[in-house]
């Protein structure tokens, strides 16, 4: 498995609604038609109005390589080029293990409890979604979550990314992506008031279904090489 994470910073934040609207059919097409695509979300960051958060999950290198040659990829890139970016940071991550965040109790676990071996210094990505039973609750929930998201990003050591955002393709869905430096930073987050406050906010809704997984990654590198070509292989190993 390969994960791509990115943050796009728009040159003009007022253009974000237009960008998200134009990206929606391209996201749906990628999810529906490209083999090996397990997640593909470009969503508005509720805590920073100029940013779009990106999370992709691909089955293997072949499926990601095929995506980089697909019209969906080129159309998405052209659209954001027309909208205008002030900056973009994108990484791909090689996944070595994955499992649910919660054990059977259910309790959030930072260690990989289903694995015999632990790699406590490897980065961990937490990703998934929350489907609200009442989609009309999503907008207010995300607005209320913005200060909690910023507090987690700014105050918790080892937090590289922490975004709960509106999936443009599903009106009931909140997309989740977090990046933590290692086991210790994620473990501390699960004992932090930010984690409990976010959980209480989500549980204040009338009902929800969720799916959260954590992914252990042993390698990350830029998506683009020095020639600005998107690479599905891990070229820094060459």
Ranges and model annotations:
Residues 136-138, 143-154, 159-160, 164-167:
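A contiguous binding-surface segment within folded domains or other stable secondary-structure elements
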């Amino acid at each position: 498995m390969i994960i791509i994470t990115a943050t796009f910073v728009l040159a003009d934040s007022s253009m974000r609604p237009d960008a998200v609207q134009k990206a929606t059919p391209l996201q749906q097409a990628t999810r529906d038609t490209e083999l090996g695509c397990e997640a593909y979300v470009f969503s508005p960051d509720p805590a920073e109005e100029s940013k779009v958060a990106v999370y992709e999950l691909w089955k293997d290198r072949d499926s990601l390589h095929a995506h980089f040659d697909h019209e969906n990829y080129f159309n998405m890139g052209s659209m954001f080029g027309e909208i205008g970016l002030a900056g973009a940071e994108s990484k791909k991550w090689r996944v070595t293990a994955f499992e649910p965040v919660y054990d059977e109790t259910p309790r959030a676990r930072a260690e990989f409890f289903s694995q015999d071996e632990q790699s406590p210094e490897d980065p961990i990505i937490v990703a998934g979604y929350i489907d609200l039973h009442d989609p009309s609750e999503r907008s207010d929930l995300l607005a209320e979550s913005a200060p909690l998201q910023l507090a987690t990003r700014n105050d918790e050591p080892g937090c590289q990314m922490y975004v709960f955002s509106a999936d443009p393709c599903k009106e009931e869905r909140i997309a989740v992506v977090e990046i933590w430096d290692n086991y210790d930073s994620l473990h501390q987050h699960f004992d932090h008031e930010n984690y409990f406050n976010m959980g209480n906010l989500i549980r204040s809704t009338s009902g929800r279904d969720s799916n959260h997984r954590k992914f252990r990654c042993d390698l990350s590198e830029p998506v683009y090489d020095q020639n600005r070509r998107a690479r599905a292989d891990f070229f820094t190993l060459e």
